[in-house]
Amino acid sequence: MKKIVSMIVAAAVLFSAACASASETAEYMWAELPEFISFVTEPCSNIALFSADYNEDDIIRKIYEGAAEQRSEITVSDSPLVEDSALTSSEIGKKTGEILADIILKVKYTYPEMYFVKNGFTVRRYTSGRVSVELNYSEGIDNVQKRMRLYAAFKEDILSLITEDMTDFQKAVTVHDYIVMNLKYDTSYNVYDAVNMALGGSGVCQGYAQMFYDICANELGMGCGFAVGQNKTPGEAGHIWNVINIDGAWYHTDATYDDPLFIDSETEALTDAPLRVSHKYFLISDEKLKSINPNDSIDRENIDCAVECSDAYYDENRPWDDSSSAQIIVNDGAIYYISGNKIMKKSDAEEAVCIITEGANHIEAGIGIYGDLLFACYKQSIYWIKLSTGESGQFYNSSSGSAMIKYLRIDGGVLRFTLSEPNSVRFSVGAVPLGETDGQILGAELIDGKIVALLRSTAKKAALYAADSEGFVKRASVVPGLNRVFAEYTGDAAYSLRLLLWTDGLKPLDAR
């Protein structure tokens, strides 16, 4: 099961014995690993909702603005946050520190760009009533700005998939599936925030939850928040996930648990399962959450969550549960998904229809859409289905012995797929460019888990591609007579080509 290292809050409060005319300073130290926190934002709001006697929204704004400029001291209030004649000065100082610790946590969770704010801080209370905090920063503004530009580009890739006519469900599943399919769980437990998770490609549950929140709440204006569960074993790591508002009702969504892992049969290491996405923990109720996995190490009976997720609509209406970890595709106002051995299409408020029959044998566990073509995999082949006419045909056939194509996805005009040997849990990843959709991929070879060359052929011409670290490069366009092409490019060390080019009679040229 996916875990993060234990998170423990240790607080030490120190008070000076200042006289009444001098400033009174209280220090509240925060442990290096902060505790999880639960809160929500309502739809179309980009600030968390809290209930308090003081203006927390105003304090959040001041801390955010001050931290963005990396000020050494930030005034959060001109008057005391705690006024109670029954409390001693030390007790007031401690309570003030606890309040601000909670608020700073909320700032860090709500805004991933605050990742550079370290966990230790100092609270200062002055005789005038003014309250300030001194924050510590892990890196300078210039480096933060560079990282944020990269993070903004990552988010833009997700947001480019969102259209104004999408339903709440379609937006949520698009964000969920993109995060799961493009990122992986950090089994070294080093990355906790969304920014560094996006830049490095991996993170723990805190990073998954923060990124889902940032896109859904901050960018799309959807109601979203965090829920927390403690480990059933005292002292072991807890877990954090999201709650999301869909059409006025709240549901649990756990992208971390929906990102499959497997144990590598050779290294015995816990490894990301590429191109796979589960929806087992997507849009479920409180009751479903409690019953979904009785052996879960997380106590789902006693969670910390600011809202009730009592609506069971998606508990009972989730045909994609049978999709074997295939992506749910949103395209032209409809969703496409695998249910059993059928590819289904469902438009909003309409019944789902099957666009591929049970006997078509085109379905394994992956689908993708590029223009008017839907791609699906079965055994050693990838097939295409023309959505406008229902025509279908073979697009690609693996040349890697008995390896089976299991999963696929399309991103940026490139179709990526996984290959695995029978009775093995190891995966290789290949890719095919989709710039020319009228031809069929005739042959390819995987080297070190990456496809390094392929041939696309139509009745009149053929094109040879090679992949290097920069991406796909079109090397030649030729008419039939492929022995010449084969001889010319197999010795090209720059691309490490190892081709199987197929021609008449489907005979490999290198065997003739």
For each feature predicted by the language model, list its residue ranges.
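Linear, non-domain "peripheral" regions
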Residues: 21-156, 346-358, 384, 393-397
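Residue position within the beta-strands of beta-propeller blades
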Residues: 337-338, 375-377, 416-419
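Blade-level signature of beta-propeller repeat domains, shared across WD40, Kelch, NHL, RCC1
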Residues: 402-433
